[in-house]
């Protein structure tokens, strides 16, 4: 037998098992009648491999007494089995009753815990393989429902028993084979062996189909249609066949459901574990039987999900599950096959005895408890019996009886099942077994399975059911749902309408089945009757009559519901609803009253039981609370008293401090006034000199001609020789040389002790201890000694100047002449090198004393220290020093430095200044002193004539080239009032104001005071400093070393200035990387290795450990505002340097507030003013803030006018700062400096600018940003508006307009219609219908054969006017007169006349056209033109000019008329450029195809050539519209004004500097200047530092360059652009101080023309607000600061973004919310940088990097002190009381204070005795014991 036939036979037998019929009547033996009802074996389409599940519900039964009992199957049991909830391992539909019962017993409703390993021994396959093979079975959900319905519809009387042995054998084989296929191993662990089932030798079919396939081919069972059945077959056979098909279909659907669920569980497991389905393989998933998956599958088993009783996985896992319990459950749920028989040939039969448990429900013979147990009995017993081979002892005795009784009780003798208890009792005829069975209907029945190998029943022995199984059964019983009751519950009818309707068919299902009329029944008569009825109804419907004649109308009326009278029940319900709310309220009220009563009773008894104890506790709590409150109030009063006393003490201390501060301020003012007075007296001693100055003293530059340069070079050479001689002398040691040339310091009080070095003091000051008093160093006392001839009165020099005298060049000389002069001087110096070497060699053999005398450095022999009192004989100017020498035999050599202000200081101490009482007088004195010092005429510089003469006698080679006379050297007869001479080492001539500054610096050095030179930019602070250092070398013998710290960008400028004006100094430029700096430090500590060291702020911080160890004479800080922050690391580092003197150079000593100025002042005087002669102390930071900073800041920020008190405070501040600060403005000191004029040019917005401006302001986002108050958003909006004002391309670039190119034109869509129209139009020849030759409309017809002469002759032959009726009018035709013959003839003749006249008229018309035909050109002209050129076509003359041979055969005059395409384009280029600018919105690229339909590119290859496309540029202009270059100017109002301004400046020969803030504006300006053809240069932040000087020199030298465009962020302080006399600010910068610096680049020394400053401001924009705020600040600066004469930068701070708003805080009509967010200056600067473009941002950063290399140090907070015993770095000056008050005054004050304290104590005691108030007592007590309370 083939596998296919085996599978088919297996399916048939399986379907037969399900649909086996029951016997007609029960019998304990064989059927008496011998009738055996055989069931038809219906074909089944199920294949063998598709049934891998065990038929665990089947039991093997052995024959008893040689008979095989017939097991009936009831319809109710079939219905129950079709709806079972736990499929279990045997997932199939069973029809046999015994099998159904076995399934009900075996398949428990509880959750089965799956085994970790399930192994099948059948043909090497396991359960997983079987499930995998069955996973591909198609779904059968629909067929399952049909099979279930069909099984329910089977009539009871159709069932029959099957008692054939072959049938029983097949059933046993099938059960055993299916059991052996899928019986799993119930071992608890993997180590145990699996349960192996031996194959049944008699069942060959399961062995053949045991091996599953991966893709089982199991076709879906089909339902045989009724038409395919045998018409002669009985109805029972048809039903049986249909039943078997339905059951097979349902079985297939159930298997599909199970397989589909299994695959879904596996997919869910994969998703749960691996999240994604990427690596999911169905074939691999089917073979997965791991422990993890088995556990996961157990939670999703269909047995638990379909079990409605709740005894699944959820119920079973609720309690604690032990191993014993699990094993017991697994044993109870496992299905084990009994051992095979010993004799293989003996077939095994199975007898299944089933008790019909469900029949008790309709019969009502069982109570509710046992019916529920029986109805939901889990299939446990059968499975347990089959596995263990024995059952419980309690079931042995009744098992056989139960099984027999179940067979007999099910059916009555007539084969019908009884529906009630009476029929059932009548059918049992006194049978004992039946009586026993009937007497015990509620007994629990179990099926008995006997061994197939024995004939007699096998007695089961073994242990009883375990306790775990009892608990499991009890748990299952508890979890099972309550089944339906055996009898329907009683109906509680409350109303008539609630009475149920009668059942149809009496509730009998059989009657319902019999009511159906099946096909092929002998009921044709009914169909005939119905047919007649249908015919009649159809006829009425077709006739339009109503279908039901009795209706009478076709309108359907709704059936009205008959109103029902209210019954008693209705009234009862209404009363219940109405009284319900009242009852609820009454119940709540009763509950509330009950609670109240209960509480009252409880409170009563509580009071009765514990009243006394409770009252005691309450009283105790009250007293404790009262005590706490009293204590709190008393402490509050004492705290108040302490606070009052503390406030009194603080007020007294504050008053005392104010008093001491006032005294200190007065002392400072007194000291400053005295010092200023002395400076005024010293600097005005030469007022008696003759004021007649030579014109050379007022020259505008300190460069001189060749003679002056050679003279200073000679002086420098002398000095160099002197230094060389001193170095080469072996007899003089360095110490002796130092004693001879270096001054000896002296203390300020005149003592003879040496002064210690100031390094320790400055280090201590840097550490924050400013109270340490260190002896100050005095200035050097030695100076070059004048000769005796210098004491005589100088004689007046001859007014005539020799040829060798110094001539001052005018400022208008060109730079080229100066460069040539410098080159000539350098050549002369090179020629003199040989002679200088010879002079040095001769001087080398001269003793040092003679050399000193020769060069004016003689030593005095006077050693008297009293010479300091006779100052009128020893000093000649304000820095004259006493000459002292060492005494004989003394070890200490002291040089006394006397200051002329000591005597005046003593006088001032005797006459104290009452600052408070007479402030006006003091201020007047100060103002007079300053005005006298600043406004006095420029005095002449004196040069000793005798000294020069003797020097010339010593070195005659230089006397001829040195001028001994100056025009300004006229002195008075007072020899002691001579001014300081200019150092002879200094090359060049100082200006008068520079000479004053030089003398002021010298006086500072002489007085031992540090100072600030704060001249305005461009006044020569550098040359004044160089002059001071030269003076120290020449007159004091102090050669350094000096340290100059400058910004990196001006280090080169310092080196150049030193080499230019002081070449005799050795300059060390300290820069480079670490290695280069290390090489430059070689010989660092060698004496005279260098005189001046120039470095930057960055390097001085990097190498501070090196600079700190070296002693410096002068520490010069250029751009000293770099140390304005005393908390910065730079300030603290430089403060600790070892330097004798300090000089600060800055153009802006006060940038932000007065604390910046205080930082500079404290840096100058770390010890305060005590080191000055006369004592005194400079204020500390807090006092300075209280005195000056806070009041002035408040007055300035408030914007109000200053009151008298504030004005007096400002005057005091001027008086304090004036002795240490010198500041001159260019407008004050440089009288010949050209004027500066400022202009504001308002510009209108262009149309595009106005559109963009209004569009941006109208945006919702802009309004939201302005109203938000976020300063970042507001600044961004302001920056966008400024871009629109500067140029619209900055905001939005004008686009390049192009046409939209369409690959397919619109005409292409109508191609088909066009062809259709053309075809229809061309069907007829239009020229055949219309003769154009008649009307001369064919204009080209006569061009070839008609000439002009012929046309003239034709016009002559025109005879139209001679034709008849030509001039007569044609009458109107009349109607025919048919009334009479005459009338008819008349009308007829008239018609003929009309026709004749019309004919002649038409002939004349045609003749007129034919005779007037004339050609346009004529054949003659065409022939002539053709003959003039080539015969093919006329060509331009350019193509034939090269052909000389054809000169005679062509007419050049004619050919010149013909122009080529290129020539014509050139001639029309102006029109093309002007008008070819409009581009179409869209173009189509396929238009040539439609415009020239018959012309192809291959037909005319010459048209494809590039030369042919001469109109391509024109086409490009029409396709792509580039913005016109002129739009760059006309789109911007500022550029329109700039065009007008540039034209006017160009005509006047002016040159302009154009400044802007934005880098992109520079690009636009470049395009603008290139468009107009102006020459220009550009300098921005990206320009390298070394290129800036070259650009500057090129602009100043080349007058052809009209403009220089620069960025305000370009940096480079000190750039000289005096070649331009016009400055234009294209846009306003955020920082107004930057604009001042930009102006100074043109308006500075060297400028010969007036400078005009222009500002472009766009009207009605935010630029007007910016200009208004800037003007206000400049006005306030002019009123408040310039009057102080010490600073112009107080209010030159950055413009705030709020300044650009209107006075009402609006921009246009949009109100801007200004939120107070505490935004700092750095935040605002960062916001500005963010709002700007990237290029401008980078330029600003580079500029700031150049100006402030370590800008981060300015904001750096002071580092916290980490070391103990280290004071803060914040400097505090001495108080006024330190060392200022004498001892006797202190003792007197102490005695007075003690006396006052005693008096106060006595008064307090008296007040305590007489005090009537507790408050006074408390205050007095606190004051008496204040140390305790404090």
Curated annotation (Swiss-Prot):
Gene3D superfamilies: P-loop containing nucleotide triphosphate hydrolases, SWI2/SNF2 ATPases, N-terminal domain, Tandem AAA-ATPase domain. A motif (DEAH box) lies at residues 1118-1121. Its EC number is 3.6.4.12. Residues 1002-1167 form the Helicase ATP-binding domain. GO terms for cellular component: Swr1 complex. Residues 602-679 form a coiled coil. Residues 556-628 form the HSA domain. ATP binds at residues 1015-1022. Residues 1-204, 329-465, 681-921, 940-974, 1754-1814 are annotated as: Disordered. Belongs to the SNF2/RAD54 helicase family. SWR1 subfamily. Component of the SWR1 chromatin-remodeling complex. This is Helicase SWR1. It comes from Mycosarcoma maydis. The gene is SWR1.
């Amino acid at each position: 037998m083939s596998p296919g036939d085996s599978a088919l036979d297996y399916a048939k037998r399986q379907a037969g098992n399900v649909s086996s019929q029951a016997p007609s009547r029960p019998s304990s033996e064989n059927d008496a009648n011998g009738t055996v009802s055989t069931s038809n074996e219906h074909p089944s389409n199920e294949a063998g491999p598709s049934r891998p599940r065990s038929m665990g519900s089947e039991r093997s039964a052995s024959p008893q007494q040689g008979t095989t009992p017939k097991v009936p199957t009831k319809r109710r049991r079939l219905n129950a089995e079709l709806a079972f909830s736990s499929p279990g391992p045997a997932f199939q539909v069973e029809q046999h009753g015994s099998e159904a019962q076995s399934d009900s017993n075996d398949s428990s409703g509880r959750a089965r815990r799956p085994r970790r390993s399930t192994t099948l021994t059948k043909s090497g396959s396991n359960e997983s393989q079987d499930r995998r093979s069955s996973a591909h079975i198609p779904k059968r959900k629909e067929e399952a429902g049909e099979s279930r319905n069909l099984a329910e519809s089977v009539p009871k009387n159709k069932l029959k028993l099957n008692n054939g042995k072959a049938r029983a054998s097949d059933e046993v084989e099938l059960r055993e084979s299916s059991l052996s296929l899928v019986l799993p191993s119930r071992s608890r662990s993997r180590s145990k062996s699996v349960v192996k089932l031996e194959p049944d030798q008699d069942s060959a079919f399961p062995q053949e189909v045991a091996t599953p396939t991966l893709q089982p081919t199991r076709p879906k069972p089909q339902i045989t249609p009724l038409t395919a059945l045998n018409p002669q077959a009985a109805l029972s056979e048809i039903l049986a066949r249909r039943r078997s098909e339905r059951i097979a279909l349902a079985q297939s659907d159930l298997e599909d459901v199970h397989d589909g669920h299994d695959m879904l569980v596996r997919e869910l497991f994969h998703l749960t574990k691996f999240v994604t389905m990427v690596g999911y393989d169905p074939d691999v998933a089917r073979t997965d039987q791991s422990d993890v998956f088995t556990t996961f599958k157990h939670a999703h088993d269909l047995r638990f999900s379909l079990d409605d009783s709740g005894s699944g996985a959820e119920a079973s896992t609720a309690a604690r599950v032990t191993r014993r319990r699990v094993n017991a459950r697994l044993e109870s749920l496992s299905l084990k096959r009994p051992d095979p028989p010993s004799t293989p040939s003996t077939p095994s039969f199975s007898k299944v005895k089933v008790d019909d448990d469900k029949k008790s429900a309709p019969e009502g013979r069982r109570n509710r408890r046992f019916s529920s147990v029986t109805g939901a009995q889990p299939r446990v017993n059968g499975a347990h019996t089959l596995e263990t081979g024995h059952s419980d002892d309690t079931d042995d005795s009744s098992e056989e009886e139960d099984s027999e009784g179940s067979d007999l009780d099910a059916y009555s003798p007539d084969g019908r099942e009884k529906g009630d208890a009476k029929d059932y009792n009548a059918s049992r005829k006194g049978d004992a077994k039946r009586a026993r069975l009937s007497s015990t209907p509620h007994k629990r029945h179990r099926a008995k399975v006997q061994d197939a190998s024995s004939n007699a029943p096998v007695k089961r022995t073994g242990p009883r059911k375990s306790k775990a199984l009892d608990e499991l059964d009890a748990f299952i019983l508890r979890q099972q749902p309550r089944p339906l009751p055996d009898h329907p519950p009683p109906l509680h009818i409350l109303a008539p309408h609630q009475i149920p309707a009668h059942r149809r068919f009496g509730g009998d299902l059989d009657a319902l089945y019999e009511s159906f009329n099946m096909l092929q029944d002998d009921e044709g008569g009914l169909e005939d009757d119905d047919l007649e009825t249908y015919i009649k109804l159809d006829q009425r419907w077709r006739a339009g009559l109503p279908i039901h004649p009795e209706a009478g109308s076709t309108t359907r009326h709704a059936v009205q519901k008959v109103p029902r009278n209210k019954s008693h029940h209705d009234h009862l319900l209404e009363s219940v609803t109405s009284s319900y709310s009242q009852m609820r309220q009454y119940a709540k009220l009763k509950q509330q009253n009950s609670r109240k009563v209960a509480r009252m009773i409880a409170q009563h008894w509580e009071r009765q039981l514990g009243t006394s104890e409770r009252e005691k506790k309450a009283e105790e709590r009250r007293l404790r609370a009262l005590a706490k409150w009293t204590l709190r109030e008393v402490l509050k009063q004492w705290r108040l008293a302490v606070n009052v006393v503390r406030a009194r003490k603080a007020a007294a201390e504050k008053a005392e401090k104010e008093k001491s501060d006032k005294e200190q301020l007065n002392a400072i003012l007194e000291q400053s006034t005295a010092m200023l007075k002395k400076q005024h007296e010293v600097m005005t001693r030469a007022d008696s000199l003759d004021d007649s100055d030579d014109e050379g003293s007022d020259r505008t530059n300190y460069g001189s001609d060749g003679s002056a340069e050679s003279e200073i070079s000679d002086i420098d050479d002398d000095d160099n020789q002197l230094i060389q001689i001193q170095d080469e002398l072996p007899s003089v040691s360095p110490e002796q040389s130092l004693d001879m040339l270096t001054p000896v310091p002296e203390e300020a009080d005149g003592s003879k002790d040496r002064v210690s070095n100031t390094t320790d003091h400055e280090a201590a000051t840097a550490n924050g201890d400013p109270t340490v008093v260190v002896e100050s160093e005095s200035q050097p006392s030695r100076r070059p000694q004048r000769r005796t001839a210098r004491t005589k009165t100088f004689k007046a020099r001859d007014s005539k100047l020799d040829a060798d005298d110094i001539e001052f060049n005018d400022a208008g000389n060109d730079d080229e002449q100066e460069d040539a002069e410098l080159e000539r001087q350098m050549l002369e110096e090179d020629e003199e090198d040989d002679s200088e070497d010879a002079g040095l060699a001769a001087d080398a053999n001269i003793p040092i004393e003679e050399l000193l005398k020769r060069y004016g450095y003689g030593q005095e022999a006077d050693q008297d220290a009293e010479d300091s009192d006779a100052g009128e004989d020893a000093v000649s100017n304000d820095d004259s020093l006493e000459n002292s020498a060492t005494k004989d035999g003394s070890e200490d050599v002291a040089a006394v430095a006397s200051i002329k202000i000591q005597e005046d200081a003593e006088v001032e101490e005797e006459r104290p200044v009452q600052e408070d009482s007479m402030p006006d007088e003091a201020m007047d004195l100060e103002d007079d002193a300053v005005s006298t010092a600043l406004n006095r005429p420029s005095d002449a510089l004196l040069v000793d004539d005798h000294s020069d003469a003797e020097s010339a006698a010593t070195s005659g080679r230089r006397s001829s080239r040195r001028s001994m006379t100056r025009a300004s050297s006229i002195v008075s007869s007072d020899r002691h009032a001579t001014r300081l001479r200019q150092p002879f080492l200094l090359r060049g001539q100082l200006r008068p104001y520079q000479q004053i500054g030089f003398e002021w610096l010298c006086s500072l050095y002489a007085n031992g005071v540090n100072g600030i030179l704060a001249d305005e930019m461009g006044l020569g602070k550098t040359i004044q400093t160089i002059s001071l250092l030269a003076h120290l070398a020449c007159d004091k013998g102090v050669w350094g070393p000096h340290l100059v710290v400058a910004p990196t960008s001006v280090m080169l400028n310092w080196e150049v200035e030193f080499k230019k004006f002081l070449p005799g100094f050795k300059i060390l430029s300290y820069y480079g990387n670490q290695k280069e700096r290390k090489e430059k430090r070689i010989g660092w500590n060698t004496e005279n290795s260098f005189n001046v060291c120039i470095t930057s702020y960055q390097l001085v911080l990097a190498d501070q450990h090196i600079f700190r160890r070296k002693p410096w004479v002068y520490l010069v800080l250029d751009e000293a505002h770099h140390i304005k922050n005393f908390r910065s690391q730079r300030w603290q580092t430089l403060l600790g340097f070892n330097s004798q003197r300090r000089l600060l150079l800055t153009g802006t000593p006060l940038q932000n507030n007065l604390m910046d100025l205080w930082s500079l002042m404290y840096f100058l005087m770390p010890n305060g003013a005590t080191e000055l002669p006369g004592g005194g102390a400079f204020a500390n930071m807090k006092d300075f803030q209280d005195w000056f900073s806070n009041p002035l800041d408040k007055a300035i920020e408030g914007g109000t006018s200053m009151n008298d008190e504030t004005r007096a405070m400002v005057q005091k501040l001027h008086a304090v700062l004036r002795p240490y600060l010198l500041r001159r403005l260019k407008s004050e000191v440089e009288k010949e400096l050209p004027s500066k004029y400022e202009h504001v040019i308002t510009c209108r917005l262009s149309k595009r600018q106005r559109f963009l401006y209004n569009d941006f302001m109208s945006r919702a986002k802009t309004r939201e940003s302005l109203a938000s108050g976020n300063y970042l958003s507001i600044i961004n909006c302001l920056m966008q508006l400024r871009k629109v004002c500067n140029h619209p391309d900055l905001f939005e670039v004008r686009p390049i307009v192009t046409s939209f190119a369409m690959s397919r034109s619109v005409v292409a869509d109508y191609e088909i219609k066009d062809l259709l129209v053309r075809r229809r139009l061309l069907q007829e020849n239009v020229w055949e219908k219309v003769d154009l030759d008649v009307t001369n409309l064919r204009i080209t017809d006569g061009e070839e054969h008609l000439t002009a002469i012929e046309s003239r002759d034709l016009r002559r032959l025109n005879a139209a006017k001679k034709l008849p009726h030509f001039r007569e009018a044609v009458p109107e035709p009349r109607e025919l007169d048919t009334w009479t013959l005459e009338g008819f003839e008349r009308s007829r003749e008239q018609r003929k006349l009309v026709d004749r006249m019309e004919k002649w008229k038409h002939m004349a018309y045609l003749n007129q056209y034919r005779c007037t035909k004339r050609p346009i050109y004529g054949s003659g002209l065409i022939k002539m033109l053709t003959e003039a050129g080539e015969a093919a076509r006329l060509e331009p003359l350019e193509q034939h000019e090269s052909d000389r041979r054809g000169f005679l055969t062509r007419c050049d005059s004619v050919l010149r008329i013909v122009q080529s395409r290129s020539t014509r384009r050139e001639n029309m280029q102006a029109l093309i450029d002007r008008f070819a600018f409009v581009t179409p919105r869209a173009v189509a690229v396929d238009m040539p195809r439609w415009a020239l339909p018959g012309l192809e590119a291959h037909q005319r290859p010459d048209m494809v050539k590039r030369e042919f496309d001469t109109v391509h540029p024109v086409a490009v202009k029409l396709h792509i519209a580039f913005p016109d270059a002129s739009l760059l100017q006309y789109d911007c109002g500022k550029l329109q004004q700039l065009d007008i301004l540039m034209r006017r400046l160009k005509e006047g020969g002016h040159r302009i500097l154009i400044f802007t803030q934005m880098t992109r504006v520079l690009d636009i300006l470049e395009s603008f200047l290139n468009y107009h053809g102006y020459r220009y240069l550009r300098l921005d932040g990206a320009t390298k530092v070394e290129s800036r000087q070259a650009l500057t020199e090129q602009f100043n030298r080349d007058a052809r360059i009209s403009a220089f465009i620069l960025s305000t962020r370009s940096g480079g302080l000190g750039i000289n652009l005096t070649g331009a006399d016009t400055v234009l600010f294209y846009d306003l910068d955020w920082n107004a101080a930057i604009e001042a610096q930009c102006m100074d680049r043109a308006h500075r020394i060297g400028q010969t023309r007036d400078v005009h400053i222009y500002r472009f401001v766009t009207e009605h924009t935010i630029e007007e607000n910016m200009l208004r705020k800037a003007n206000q600040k400049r006005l306030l600066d002019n009123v408040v600061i310039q009057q102080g004469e010490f600073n112009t930068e107080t209010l030159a701070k950055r413009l705030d973004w709020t300044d650009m708003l209107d006075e009402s805080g609006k921009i246009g009509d949009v109100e801007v919310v200004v939120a107070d967010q505490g935004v700092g200056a750095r935040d605002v600067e960062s916001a500005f940088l963010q709002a700007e473009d990237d290029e401008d941002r980078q330029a600003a950063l580079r500029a700031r990097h150049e100006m402030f290399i370590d800008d981060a140090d300015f904001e750096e907070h002071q580092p916290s002190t980490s070391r103990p015993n280290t004071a803060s770095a914040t400097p505090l000056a001495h108080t006024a009381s330190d060392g200022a008050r004498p001892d006797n005054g202190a003792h007197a004050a102490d005695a007075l204070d003690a006396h006052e304290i005693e008096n106060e104590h006595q008064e307090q005691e008296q007040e305590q005795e007489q005090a009537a108030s507790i408050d006074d007592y408390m205050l007095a007590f606190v004051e008496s014991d204040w140390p305790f309370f404090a």
